[in-house]
Structures are given as C-alpha cells and as structure tokens.
Regions:
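A short beta-alpha structural unit
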Residues: 150-156
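Active-site glycine-rich loop that binds ribose-phosphate moieties when present
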Residues: 22-34, 67-89
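Glycine-rich anion-binding loops of enzyme active sites
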Residues: 1-59, 182-184
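Active-site-proximal betaalpha loop/short-helix elements
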Residues: 73-149
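Helix N-cap motif at beta-to-alpha junctions
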Residues: 157-162
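Solvent-exposed alpha-helices and their adjacent loops that cap or buttress functional pockets
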Residues: 13-19, 36-40, 58, 86-90, ...
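Acidic, Ser/Thr/Pro-rich beta/coil linker or hinge segments at domain junctions
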Residues: 171-218
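General beta-strand structural signal in soluble alpha/beta enzymes
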Residues: 3-7, 46-49, 96-100, 122-124, ...
Length: 218
C-alpha cells in the first residue's frame, strides 16, 4: 500500500476564488512510456507550434497591458488528438518529448543537453514565433525563448524519421511545426551540456534559461 499525497499553490486575485479547490490525479500503466530525456546524437529537435504565447499573455496581463497590446492570447489547449497521436505512431523514433511550460524552450533544451552531456544546436530563424509576441517581449526586455508555452511540445526525433514526423504533425493540424535544431557530440568540454543558437546572420550564441518573475497561472 502506498500513500499518494500531492498539492499545488495558485495565486488568484482577491475575491475571484476564495474557496477550497479539490483536484484529482490519475495513475496508470503504460506499455510504452514516452521518454523525456533520452536524446541521441543526430536527433532532430521539433517544436510543434508558436513559442512563448502563454508567457507573453500572462506578462501583459500582469503589467495591465493586455487590452493595449493586440494579438496576444494564451495557447493553452490539449495536444492528445494531435501531438500525442503522432508520438504514438512514431514511438520508437521519438527519443524525448516535453511541454515547454515554465522556463520555455530554453529551459527544456538546457535540461536535455545537461542530462545527456551533449550539445544541442538550434537555428533561431527556424523557431516559430509570431511577430506580435516577439515585438512585445523585446519591448519588455524579455527573451521569448524563456517564456512559457502551454499548447506546444518539444520533441527529439531520430534524424531518419524526423521529416516524416514533421509532415505528420502538420497533417493532423499542427501546421506551425518546425525542425529547429539537432543534437550533436560536444566539440569540446565547454560545449558539453550546452545549447548553442545559430543567429539569423550566422553568429553563435549560448542559449541559457533567463528567469522572470511570473505567477504560476495555468
């Protein structure tokens, strides 16, 4: 017998929800669990949609700017009928899958690189981000790579099947999916466990998570 105890804290405006919330958790047995960090050299990194949508929206709301900045909307949604479906179809070729929530894709990529002692190279011009989101976050001095997304996933996929997975994602409705990078053997000790970004003009920069004080609103 095992006792399962869990809890969570939410920050809500006064008067909006001054009651006890009861949540539930489900446990099950998976025949083929989806890994979250089993990267291999050569894997392609796929993002299934526009990044930073949720984080930008929450930041605008926190600053009282949501009504003044056009085009911002949280991307919170279910991925079970699209992304999960494709992962299950290509289960043997998907080596890692994560949702880039708090900390954005920068956090997930760095965790993957550190855990596996590999280098991940990202092509920044391939990352799907809407102009409205990028412009707002740049004006606020915030890196969109570190902002939360609630309706996309990051995948590390065998290079031999990555383009097939990409096309399948687009077929099921994830039309903004893109291959944004690849997993590499570190060229030296400094690059071990690092994420390197190739800029739009061909320069190289380290991509590291940048913290920003946002409430955990899901």
């Amino acid at each position: 017998n095992v006792s399962l105890i869990g809890g969570d804290f939410k920050v809500m405006p006064r008067g909006s929800l001054d009651k006890i919330l009861i949540t539930g958790v489900g446990l099950g047995i998976s025949k083929k669990p989806i890994p979250d960090n089993e990267l291999r050299v050569g894997d392609k990194i796929i993002v299934t949609g526009h990044v930073a949508e949720h984080g930008a929206t929450i930041l605008a709301a926190q600053l009282g700017l949501l009504d003044k900045v056009k085009g911002l909307k949280s991307d919170t949604r279910s991925l079970t009928k699209t992304v999960l479906k494709v992962i299950e179809e290509f289960r043997d070729y998907v080596h890692a899958a994560r949702d880039p929530t708090r900390g954005g894709i920068a956090s997930v990529l760095n965790e993957w690189a550190r855990t596996n002692n590999l280098t991940i190279r990202i092509h920044k011009d391939k990352i799907p981000v809407r102009d409205e989101v990028r412009d707002f976050l740049e004006a606020m001095g915030v890196d969109y790579l570190s902002m939360a997304s609630e309706g996309i996933a990051l995948l590390a996929v065998d290079s031999g099947r990555a383009h097939e997975v990409l096309e399948r994602l687009r077929e099921v409705g994830e039309v903004n999916s893109e291959i944004i990078g690849e997993v590499m053997e570190p060229a030296n000790n400094f690059l071990k466990g690092r994420v390197v970004g190739i800029t739009e003009v061909g320069g190289k920069v380290l991509i590291e998570p940048k913290s920003i004080n946002l409430p955990r609103i899901c």
